[in-house]
């Protein structure tokens, strides 16, 4: 098996990949993550996942590289990482009582053969109708400023969620494991 590399700085994606009990390393790709003008959210996520994998391939030309990215959308509006407290307040205020689709893009790039498999796995979350006090309390406790849509379902964020719908709950955290297992199998990597 070629070296397996996760092209991500996310500790949550690292934890998810570790569940598969495969040896892997982590590299943080340094790319511009800005959406392009008029770009559909799922295309933004897919483009960034692929760009991250290709960036890491520049340094590791014999590796099997996993790239991923996530973009949240509310009625077509892209909700990226808030980065600041004020932006997170704005996002959660906008999202309260509404449904948000998280587009989790995944690619597996074989740097040696230059074969790339890619997909976007959507996951829908309906948020509770939170008060301003609840939003502030959540943000003070969780500080999800590096998470698309200002929510971390793997932590206290589950308390601000009313319902979830999708094929793979791991997609909400940012790494669709069910689809990843299929992609790895097509590269000769069996998880079990």
Swiss-Prot record:
SUPFAM superfamilies: ITPase-like. This is 7-methyl-GTP pyrophosphatase. Gene3D superfamilies: 3.90.950.10. PANTHER family: BIFUNCTIONAL DTTP/UTP PYROPHOSPHATASE/METHYLTRANSFERASE PROTEIN-RELATED, BIFUNCTIONAL DTTP_UTP PYROPHOSPHATASE_METHYLTRANSFERASE PROTEIN-RELATED. It comes from the Bacteria. The record marks 12, 70, 154 as: Important for substrate specificity. It catalyses: N(7)-methyl-GTP + H2O = N(7)-methyl-GMP + diphosphate + H(+). It is an enzyme of class 3 (hydrolase). One of its GO terms (cellular component) is cytoplasm. It comes from Methylobacillus flagellatus (strain ATCC 51484 / DSM 6875 / VKM B-1610 / KT). Its cofactor is a divalent metal cation. Belongs to the Maf family. YceF subfamily. Its EC number is 3.6.1.-. Keywords: Cytoplasm, Hydrolase, Nucleotide metabolism. Pfam families: Maf. The active site is at 69 (proton acceptor). One of its GO terms (molecular function) is nucleoside triphosphate diphosphatase activity. One of its GO terms (biological process) is nucleotide metabolic process. It is found in: Cytoplasm. Nucleoside triphosphate pyrophosphatase that hydrolyzes 7-methyl-GTP (m(7)GTP). May have a dual role in cell division arrest and in preventing the incorporation of modified nucleotides into cellular nucleic acids. InterPro entries: ITPase-like_fam, Maf-like.
């Amino acid at each position: 098996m070629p070296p397996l590399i996760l092209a991500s700085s996310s500790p949550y994606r690292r934890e998810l990949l570790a569940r598969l009990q495969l040896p892997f390393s982590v590299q943080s790709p340094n790319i511009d993550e800005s959406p392009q003008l008029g770009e559909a959210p799922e295309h933004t996520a897919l483009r960034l996942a692929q760009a991250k994998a290709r960036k890491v391939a520049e340094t590791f030309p014999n590796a099997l590289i996993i790239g991923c990215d996530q973009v949240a959308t509310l009625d077509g509006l892209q909700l990226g990482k808030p980065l600041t407290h004020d932006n997170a307040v704005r996002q959660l205020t906008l999202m309260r009582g509404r449904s948000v689709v998280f587009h989790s893009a995944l690619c597996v790039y074989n740097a040696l053969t230059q074969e790339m498999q890619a997909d976007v796995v959507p996951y829908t979350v309906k948020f509770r109708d939170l008060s301003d006090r609840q939003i502030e309390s959540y943000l003070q406790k969780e500080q999800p400023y590096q998470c698309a849509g200002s929510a971390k379902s793997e932590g206290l964020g589950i308390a601000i969620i009313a319902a979830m719908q999708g094929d793979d709950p791991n997609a909400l955290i940012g790494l669709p494991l069910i689809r990843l297992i299929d992609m790895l199998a097509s590269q000769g990597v069996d998880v079990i």
